[in-house]
Amino acid sequence: MPFFPIIKLKFESVVGNILTLEYIFVAKISMSDRVRVRFAPSPTGGLHLGGVRTALFNYLFAKQQGGDFILRVEDTDQTRFVSGAEEYIIECLKWCGITPDEGPGFGGEYGPYHQSERKPLYRQYAEQLVNNGFAYYAFDTPAELEEKREELSNFQYGHAHRKEMTNSISLSQTEVAELLAKDTPHVIRLKVPQDETISFDDLIRGEVSFETSLIDDKVLLKADGMPTYHLAVVVDDYLMKISHAFRGEEWLPSAPVHLLLWKYLGWEDSMPQWAHLPLILKPDGHGKLSKRDGARLGFPVYAMNWKDAKTNELTQGFREIGFLPEAFVNLLAMLGWNDGTDQELFSLKELIEKFSLERINKSGAKFDFEKARWYNAEWIKRISKEELNQQVLEVFKAKGIQVADKNQLAQIIDLVKDRCTLLTDFIAQAGYFFHTPEEYDLGSVKPKWTNEKESFFIAYGAILNVITDYSAPSLEVSFKALAEEKGLKVGDVMLPFRIMLVGGKFGPAVFEISSLLGKDETINRIQNGLNLLKH
């Protein structure tokens, strides 16, 4: 059942001549309103796994409640806009199976879904706030602001200093009108009240409180007419009828600014209920996981590969190193959530059924790459043969490995999948079925190589040439019989045979390999091995 907040005012105390108010945001239940959540990324680069988890939790909650998941692109900061980033974000969501009900390319009646296309709306509401005394024009130049910061190390553009600055509070109405008439560059700032306590009920953290004396007068509308995040998120959430807002814990300090905007715009009864998600922490638990941490520790932090258009720097993604989308979604869900049981493997459908806000942790979740690899290994065993075959085929294609016989590929995958943690492991574990080994571990064979062993393989090649039953059991019988006939221990010729076939001391049962390679290829590899061992 969806929850929607209303606002109540509690008169707390009068100290001297200052009235202290506490705004308490509490929830009321609405039986008629539909759950609507949004994922609102900025198209500024690769999508961090924390961002994907935010999208996932929004999606799980919406689908469980029979609601809508909206994709909204927050592209108001044009200085940070990166071409191709939006398409990348959509592709990431698609890979994870997270399909928006509304958004760019998905339709919907509450568009446009790019904030850059909603610019006139923000100006309208910013001016409304000014007219009602909740915001003001500020004409300070960047140089003047910098000078003030140098003068006062703890400078905060708020109630303590706003009258010292160039704005519609310190200036007369005539002066303000003249500046506006001249199109003097200006911003619109929120007028944060003094000495008030703002509290709200977070769906994860319970009651959270803030003192307004610690909050500066945030810019709502920039000099170029574009809104800041603070104004845009409130206006868009209201107009798009967002019922619940899930976002990372790092946005918690912005909550009081947004609460004030909901109140000042007169939209208290429509304000969404918030849930601030725990951070994804570095493996040691000290600090938020960053892109640099991944590079330093050798694992990705992006969902998919991201190439910086300016530097051409390529940052690896989970998809490209060989993660299944099912495993990636599963591990993300378990970063800060569990269903209260020992179950660890969940399909997207199961996550939708079992997801609950009550089971989200307040504290941050350590990222464990080895655990992530475990999830992937388990999902390689769990997904259908058809799906796994297709995934491996895509990996092979990306590496230029040609597969002519898909039935043979299916047999090979079934043979080696228990040895694979990542999809890319199939290249090492199965690539030799489709091309001769590029390297051979001859150092493990040459020291003990003898004329007797060479004679054995020449004879075994001749046997293979005429054998009719090329099954693994038949090959094993003939191999062992010949070894006995030649007076050799099976173990003494088994390792050379494996290295001739695959290049190293790895892989499944050697006769299974030989059977799948086929008669001609096995004979060719034996001959190639003999030639290499002569040098």
Regions found by a protein language model. Give the residues of each.
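Catalytic adenosine-cofactor/nucleotide-binding cores of aminoacyl-tRNA synthetases and other
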Residues: 268, 273-440, 502-535
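N-terminal amphipathic/basic-hydrophobic helices that include classical n-h-c signal peptides
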Residues: 1-30
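Glycine- and acidic
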Residues: 37-43, 71-75, 240-246, 310-315, ...
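Short, glycine- and charge-enriched coil/turn segments that flank and shape catalytic ligand pockets
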Residues: 147, 154, 175-183, 385-390, ...
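N-terminal Rossmann-like or analogous alpha/beta NTP/dinucleotide-binding catalytic cores
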Residues: 23, 29-154, 253-265, 327
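Active-site cores that bind ATP or allylic diphosphates and position pyrophosphate for catalysis
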Residues: 137, 141-293, 300, 314, ...
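Residue-level signal for inorganic ion chemistry
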Residues: 58, 89, 129, 133, ...
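C-terminal accessory/binding modules appended to enzymatic or scaffolding proteins
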Residues: 445-501, 506
